């Protein structure tokens, strides 16, 4: 479960966007900072969090990124921890974070816990293996 969030944007924003980091860079990396600041400048409230393996790196523990399926429950727990928002909640992330969000999006959308999905740099396949697509679950998605 995420220990803390980084927030950007107005507390009373009409839409909150929850973002998870990519496989190798934390929630406060240059690219995540830039994306959060740009979205906040448009009036969105941004809530960034880290998966457990990445948060552990802050205390010196180095673990490789787990499979996306492994951290799906952590994303759901982050939604729970964030709690009610002023308006609709959109989930997403950078690279692996966006992929994980996309993997839980339809169930969270069906449960009326989220209103949409935003992926920044979706990893369509593992590096150097374009034949191993990670897109099957995207076909027929119901989440906007």
Locations of the language-model features?
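Serine-hydrolase catalytic machinery in alpha/beta-hydrolase-like enzymes
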Residues: 1-89
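Primarily recognizes the serine-hydrolase "nucleophile elbow" in alpha/beta-hydrolase
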Residues: 75-143
């Amino acid at each position: 479960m995420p220990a803390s969030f980084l927030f950007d944007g107005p507390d009373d924003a009409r839409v909150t966007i929850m973002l998870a980091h990519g496989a190798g860079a934390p929630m406060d990396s240059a690219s995540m900072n830039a994306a959060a600041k740009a979205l906040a400048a448009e009036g969105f409230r941004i809530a960034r969090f880290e998966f457990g393996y990445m948060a552990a790196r802050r205390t010196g523990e180095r673990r490789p990124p787990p499979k996306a399926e492994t951290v799906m429950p952590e994303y759901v727990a982050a939604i729970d921890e964030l709690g009610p928002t002023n308006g609709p909640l959109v989930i997403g992330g950078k690279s692996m974070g966006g992929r994980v969000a996309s993997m839980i999006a339809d169930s969270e959308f069906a449960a009326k816990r989220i209103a949409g999905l935003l992926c920044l740099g979706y990893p369509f396949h593992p590096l150097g293996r374009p034949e191993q697509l990670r897109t099957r679950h995207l076909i027929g998605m119901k989440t906007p």
